[in-house]
């Protein structure tokens, strides 16, 4: 067991104003951070300026790209959360991942959370993210969380949805130990 606190970083890959997905993953991140021996933080890409991936190293970009990459590289476990856009992950999340060096996620436990308006999109983002995470050599959690409109009431996640998110975090932290 590591002598330092385990670090869980959740990346919310949405460029739109905060909504249900942010509420759900922020709550799960806060609950993970409340555990002994766990530090957790949410990186909302809507709040960070990430340059277009054009081959330049992060230190030449003059924005938030390098700091976000450093946070991912230092994490013991990562959650990637994305709304489903056009049957896949968002462009802002893919753009960030295009900046990340392979060694930053190699061997790191990574979980996938996707959200779509209906259940018809449940595999799109997950399938594409699994392909990208395989490229990195990440230790991808075997079960992803998919949320849709039915998982929320009054903008808040249902108990079942919150439990799925908490179980994903527990799985990732267990793998990181």
Tell what function each PLM region has.
Residues 17-18, 86, 118-121, 154:
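Alpha-helix N-cap/loop-to-helix initiation residues
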Residues 61-64, 125, 157:
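Residue-level signature of the cytosolic catalytic core of signaling kinases
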Residues 106-107:
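A glycine-biased structural micro-motif
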Residues 147-177:
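Hydrophobic secondary-structure block in the mid-to-C-terminal portion of proteins
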């Amino acid at each position: 067991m590591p002598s330092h606190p385990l670090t869980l970083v959740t990346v919310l890959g949405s460029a739109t104003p905060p909504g249900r997905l942010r509420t759900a993953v922020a709550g799960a991140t806060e609950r993970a951070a409340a555990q002994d021996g766990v530090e957790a933080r949410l990186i909302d890409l809507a709040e960070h300026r990430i340059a277009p991936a054009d081959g330049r190293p992060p230190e030449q970009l003059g924005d938030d790209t390098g700091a976000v990459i450093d946070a991912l590289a230092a994490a013991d476990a990562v959650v990637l959360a994305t709304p489903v856009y056009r049957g896949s992950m968002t462009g802002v999340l893919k753009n960030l991942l295009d900046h990340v060096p392979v060694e930053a996620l190699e061997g790191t436990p990574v979980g996938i959370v996707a959200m779509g308006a209906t259940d018809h999109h449940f595999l799109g983002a997950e399938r594409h993210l699994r392909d990208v995470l395989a490229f990195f050599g990440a230790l991808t959690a075997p079960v992803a969380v998919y949320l849709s409109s039915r998982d929320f009431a009054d903008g808040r996640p249902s108990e079942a949805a919150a439990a799925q998110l908490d179980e994903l975090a527990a799985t990732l932290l267990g793998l990181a130990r």
